[in-house]
Amino acid sequence: MPDITIALSKGRIFEDTIPFLKAAGIVPSDDPDTSRKLIIGTNRPDVRLVMVRATDVPTYVQYGAADLGVAGKDVLLEHDGIGLYQPLDLKIARCRMMVAVRDDYDYASAVFRGARLRVATKYVKTARNHFAAKGMHVDLIKLYGSMELAPLVDLADAIVDLVSTGSTLKANHLQAIEEIMPISARLIVNQAALKLKNTAIQPLLETFSAAVPKNL
């Protein structure tokens, strides 16, 4: 079995992680976008990749099924973080977590009146903390996709979601009215593995760190 297992998710994060892997001399043997394999070997016999759902990356690393992983800050905030070390902000998959409403919704007035808003999101923990810090009372509705639909069918007054260009919001007559925080992908490491496999993991951390864009 390879010494190092790295958990990744398909899509943008995987594509943005490729330069970091190359910097460490790691080349995947298969393209996860075209391969059905969930365990992908590399040109290095001591390193393999496991392809999992983005929301599951921290869990695989936490329980030692993977030694390292790359996960968005949004995912990590919803995870308890036990047993995880987060040494690097890779500055990839960058976006913003925002509060958004319909174009015709007077959010400022609703907040001023102390209205109890319904907010749809898959980031329940983060949203709860955000609104609590503002002294707002909200009812959170957990959704797993198509957040933009919720205000359009009166399921929710607002949504909390990730926004990159804002084009999806605009196409659905929504507007972002409040930024909660900037989001990017982080390198995470199993704390036990960092101690037990330090001679193998530390060089990876150093090469990943050197590959992080310095002008962002």
Swiss-Prot record:
Which GO MF terms are attached to this record? ATP binding; ATP phosphoribosyltransferase activity
> Transmembrane stretches, by residue range?
none
| Organism taxonomic ancestry | Bacteria, Pseudomonadati, Pseudomonadota, Betaproteobacteria, Nitrosomonadales
Its UniProt domain note says: Lacks the C-terminal regulatory region which is replaced by HisZ.
Question: What is this enzyme's EC?
Answer: 2.4.2.17
Please verify whether the record's keywords include Nuclease: no
Q: Show the catalytic activity.
A: 1-(5-phospho-beta-D-ribosyl)-ATP + diphosphate = 5-phospho-alpha-D-ribose 1-diphosphate + ATP
Which is a GO BP term held by this UniProt record?
A: L-histidine biosynthetic process
Q: In which pathway does it act?
A: Amino-acid biosynthesis; L-histidine biosynthesis; L-histidine from 5-phospho-alpha-D-ribose 1-diphosphate: step 1/9
Which family is this sequence assigned to? Belongs to the ATP phosphoribosyltransferase family. Short subfamily.
Write the protein's name: ATP phosphoribosyltransferase
Q: Cross-referenced InterPro entries, in alphabetical order?
A: ATP_PRibTrfase_cat (IPR013820), ATP_PRibTrfase_CS (IPR018198), ATP_PRibTrfase_HisG (IPR001348), ATP_PRibTrfase_HisG_short (IPR024893)
GO CC terms: cytoplasm
The alphabetical list of record keywords is: Amino-acid biosynthesis, ATP-binding, Cytoplasm, Glycosyltransferase, Histidine biosynthesis, Nucleotide-binding, Transferase
Gene3D superfamilies, per database record = Periplasmic binding protein-like II
Subcellular locations according to the entry: Cytoplasm
